[in-house]
């Protein structure tokens, strides 16, 4: 997160989870990505927006490459876009180059969330018991979410 106050508001008012394995960096995203060690991060969640628009950085190939470089071999990149990248555009091509597994869904607010990982993953083979356990750790309505996901 770029602004400390945004993080504090999320933590104090919107049930932002706190856990020893979760680290939030309050800094410029590009600078942070450039300084992360190779294969050091399990998950990167990007939601780079100002008050009126998405940051152009989030749609750049260099940003996607930097995220891929920082992720562990079994790591995940989660991107929030205000519209789906063009099917034949540079951004989606770069995502496919860096992440053999790409999943997406359209949120209630009409944003597109893209999940990328470096390993084979079949989201439809997850047992209900695993989804229930995941729901206890991160309550986002996993069973309903899994019904919306599609492969890119």
Spans of features found by a protein language model:
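SAM/dcSAM-binding transferase cores
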Residues: 93, 108-152
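Short "lid" loop at the C-terminus of a central beta-strand within the Rossmann-like core
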Residues: 50-51, 82-87
